[in-house]
A protein has these predicted regions:
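Extended, subdomain-level signal for the structured scaffold at the beginning of enzyme domains
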Residues: 1-103
């Protein structure tokens, strides 16, 4: 996502994408965050920046999971959708970060 010209907060949001994600849950949230002046990144947990939604829509993520440190984000957002949620659940880096945060 492009960074808003004027940030309203120092908070950052990692929007995690796995193949089969629900595009409305992921992209509507990204849009609202952008309009609110909150920096968010679409992060692919697959082996490519292109991620396919549960309805076959291809989205290009901003970053690959292997290139980020999830602990630097204020919030992790895990959108629903099948089988996307299973892809997120099965990602060791997400599991570790959720446990580190005590969720």
């Amino acid at each position: 996502m492009p960074t808003p010209e004027k940030l309203a907060t120092d908070a950052t949001v990692a929007i995690m994408l796995a193949d089969g994600f629900e595009e409305v849950e992921a992209l509507a949230v990204a849009d609202v965050l952008y309009r609110a002046g909150v920096r968010s990144d679409l992060i692919s947990v697959t082996d490519a920046r292109h991620v396919t939604s549960s309805h076959g829509i291809r989205v290009v993520a901003d970053l690959m999971l292997e290139d980020v440190d999830l602990s630097t984000y204020t919030v992790l957002f895990l959108p629903g959708g099948m089988p996307g949620t299973l892809g997120l659940k099965g990602t060791p880096a997400i599991q570790a970060e959720v446990l580190r945060r005590g969720w």
